[in-house]
Design a protein with these regions (language model features):
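Short, conserved phosphate-binding/catalytic loop or strand-edge motifs used
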Residues: 29, 47-50
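Cys/His-rich short segments
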Residues: 1-21
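DNA strand-break repair and replication-stress modules
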Residues: 6, 13, 35, 42-43, ...
Length: 190
């Protein structure tokens, strides 16, 4: 991949809909990449505060906030991590379907064309794209590093539903919040 593609992949991974790493906008990612602080998405989890101190616009406060945000991104659900990998043709909806079907990244890595095609809404183009992604040793290496960093790469088995489960209720979130409605919805339902 060329530099703009690599930067784009990191930007996608850090985005709100994927890993939601606060304080890591497109400009900052491009700067970190150009300065050699990060070369791929796995490098985000090995950033040291010292490596950021020399960079423009990085005071102690913003470094601390960024490191905290990267750390808290490790709690993102499997489908968000899967979406963040940037597999061609795998959007949010497909990532959710894959996570619910394969339950772990290892099951997905070891899947074949038939098992992928059996997933609702996955056609040949998406299935081949997934297989190609996991046949690339660089991608496998990155996934391994992300696993070692502690990201969630499996569906956490749901506890038995309690009688007051909210999943079949309509919940309206109104007002002003620090986090997005999407995040609030995620917290309520999970």
């Amino acid at each position: 991949y060329c530099d703009p593609q690599n930067i784009g992949r990191i930007q996608h991974f850090a985005s709100r809909k994927a890993m939601n790493i606060d304080g890591l906008g497109n400009e900052r990612i491009a700067l970190f990449y150009r300065q050699g602080v990060i070369k791929n998405i796995a490098d985000l989890y090995t950033i040291s505060p010292e490596s950021l101190q020399e960079l423009e616009g990085m005071g102690d406060k913003s470094i601390e906030k960024l490191i905290d945000s990267i750390e808290s991104s490790k709690n993102r659900l499997f489908h968000k991590v899967l979406f963040g990998l940037g597999i061609r043709h795998v959007g949010e909806t497909v990532a959710i379907k894959l996570a619910n079907t394969f339950k772990s990244i290892d099951e997905l890595i070891n899947s074949d064309i038939e098992s992928l095609l059996s997933v609702n809404e996955i056609g040949e183009k998406i299935a081949e794209s997934i297989l190609n992604y996991f046949q690339d040793s660089t991608n496998i290496s990155i996934v391994k590093k992300l696993k070692n960093a502690g990201l969630i790469f499996s569906i956490q088995e749901k506890k038995e539903r309690s009688p007051n489960s909210l999943s079949d209720k309509k919940i309206v979130v109104t007002g002003t919040f620090k986090s997005s409605r999407e995040e609030i919805k995620d917290k309520i339902l999970h």
